Amino acid sequence: MPLGGRPANFSMTKTTTASRPKFIITGGAGFIGSNLTLALQDKFPDAHLTVIDDFRSGNFKNLAGYRGDFVAENLATLDWREKFGDPAAAGFDAIFHLASITDTTLHDQFVQVHDNVESFRRLLNFARPRKTRIIYASSAATYGPAAEASVESDGAAPANVYAFSKVIMDNIARGAAAESPDWIIVGLRYFNVYGPCEAHKGVPASMIYHLAQQMKAGNRPRIFKHGEQKRDFVYVKDVVEGSILALDANTSGIYNLGTGQARSFNELIDVLNKCLGTNLQPEYFDNPHAHYQNFTQADLTSARNALRYEPRFSLEDGVRDYMQWLYPAK
């Protein structure tokens, strides 16, 4: 969904392949951030990359093979000008903002909203003079409970403080884009992402990771009764590709990144059994959560039109690729 503003006749990937682009990736040691960082390094081998991460939800091991710079700072207190100098002189082509407190079970409202929102505000204040392109992680959690595919124009209904912080970030992005129509700010609502380099997250790691670990150990996979809750499970390689495609967006906007398909947890366990060579039946238990998304699915119409985003991995293909990475053949 466009945020407003006029087209910017600008193609990042076309204009930077002949030069040495400069990118910042906040949260670049985290799950999605590290996958994005290494993909940018592969796509733009001459790029100057700078990762900013405080390791609160990241791990240095995720950046094996990384050749760029690294800044260990808390974004909620980072003085961007002191660290990088005048934004016009710094000359960054784009800032990918993926850093945030992502644990939806955290109940400290001040910490989560302050860190997520103020980090974003500080980043925008630094980027504003040069109108550096911003590509930031919003979230499908902003939609709250849904019964059908979520469209970007749907009203926000955050069910937890994490989702609320992302709604506020979206509001701030809309305001900044409206004030500066030639400044490209792209928000990406990632759906239920899974894939390599998420293990360090612990409890907030994807259900695909946790269920695979249970099944690999020979245990029945434990899911809420009766396994018919559905998710738009999207492989991290697809959301990374969508994030890079945002470098070519001609207007500001907020877009869904998922597969466009909702699959049940029972279906997921069938897929895992096939990939792992197991035959384990689910162990169902009561859902203790009062606010729980029983259904998520991305409407990809806007992302296809604006970003030319097209997911490549079905649940079967993504889980197979992930299991081969997670449990390599000996």
Task: Annotate the PLM regions.
Residues 1-11:
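N-terminal amphipathic/basic-hydrophobic helices that include classical n-h-c signal peptides
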Residues 149-156, 194, 284-286, 299-302:
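Short glycine/proline- and charge-enriched loop/turn segments
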Residues 108-109, 200-201, 250:
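Active-site loop immediately N-terminal to the catalytic Tyr-X3-Lys motif
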Residues 10, 215-330:
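C-terminal substrate-binding subdomain of Rossmann-fold SDR/epimerase-dehydratase oxidoreductases
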Residues 9-191:
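N-terminal Rossmann-like NAD(P)+-binding domain of SDR-like oxidoreductases, especially those catalyzing
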Residues 148, 161, 171-231, 236-241, ...:
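NAD(P)-dependent short-chain dehydrogenase/reductase
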Residues 41, 124-128, 174, 212, ...:
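A structural alpha-helix within SAM-dependent methyltransferase catalytic domains
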